[in-house]
Each structure stands twice: as C-alpha cells, then as structure tokens.
C-alpha cells in the first residue's frame, strides 16, 4: 500500500541526518495521499542507518495505523492534525535542528530579515505558544498540532505562504507540497 509514497518518505527521512538536522532518531518526515486520506510517516525510534522504505508506517487522519509492523513516530498525531486542518500541505517535517530548536526555546517569532528568507517564507515565521499543563496531559503531540493551527488561524497566515512554524519550547515543524 502506498509503496511509492513510502519510498519518497523514506528518502526524505534519510536526508535529515545527512543535512545535520537531527540527533539520534529525533526527527521525522511524513507525506500524504489526499485521495486515499492516508499519510506515511517514519517509524518511532528506528535508526536512520537501519531503516528501510518498507518500515514506513501508513496512518489515517484520526491517528490509526493502517499498515506497518512498527509504531509510527511519536509526533504522528501532530502530523495528522496538520493534514486534517491544512488540506493544501502534502508533507510535514519535524526536527530538533540545533538553531531552530534554540530559537524555539525563546518563544519568539523569526522575523523576515531579507530576501533569502522571503524566497521561502512570505513573512515572519511564527512561534506557536507554549502548551499548558492541561494540554500536555491531554496529549502533547495532538495538542501541538492544534496549537500550530490556532496560531495560523488567529494570525490569518496561509500555510503555504509561511510553510512552517516553531513550537515554543520544542522546535520546528516545516511543511511543503510534497516530500521531495
């Protein structure tokens, strides 16, 4: 099921360590098949050197595993919320890249500082608010997605004009039209 999408997601995940964007297994890429209402995501805790395309996990937007022998990334509920609420996006990435994670700890938006920034982000990159203890207790990963959606809706930001966000105290969640 979704073999081509699994391969694309697998290859995109392999780029994370190659580009120095992750430590250990702390990062993931997913991509969606809108016609089927399913997405493919990296499995949880699997080393990038040990991973194969067949290890990718197929999930629905409700967070159910549809296919796969491994557990999906612990960030899967965040990805599911983003796919449900932002139908224009086709792939989501989450890393703990050093500089973006450091910036996210401050809880500050990333201001547009020049044309290079504007090549990808048409405005300030927002930092979604810190989650409350009640939200964390309800389910950190799903609440993360909801806080991101809240940030974009409250600020009137279009997800494909500003294709990413920081989460206060956590790190970056960028997205794109596909995983390539």
Regions found by a protein language model. Give the residues of each.
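Glycine-rich flexible loops
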Residues: 1-180
């Amino acid at each position: 099921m979704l073999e081509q999408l699994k391969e694309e997601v697998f290859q995109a995940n392999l780029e994370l360590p190659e580009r120095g964007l992750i430590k250990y297994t702390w990062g993931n890429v997913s991509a969606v098949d809108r016609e089927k209402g399913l997405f493919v995501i990296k499995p949880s805790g699997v080393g990038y050197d040990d991973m194969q395309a067949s290890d990718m996990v197929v999930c629905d937007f409700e967070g159910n595993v549809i296919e796969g022998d491994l557990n999906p990334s612990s960030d899967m509920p965040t990805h599911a919320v983003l796919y449900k609420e932002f139908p224009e996006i086709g792939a989501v990435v989450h890393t703990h890249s050093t500089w973006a994670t450091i910036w996210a700890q401050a809880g500050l938006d990333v201001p547009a500082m020049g044309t290079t920034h504007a090549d990808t982000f048409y405005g300030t990159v927002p930092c979604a608010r810190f989650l409350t203890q009640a939200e964390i207790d309800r389910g950190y990963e799903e609440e993360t997605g909801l806080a991101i959606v809240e940030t974009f809706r409250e600020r009137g930001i279009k997800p494909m004009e500003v294709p990413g966000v920081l989460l206060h105290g956590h790190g970056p969640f960028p997205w794109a039209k596909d995983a390539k």
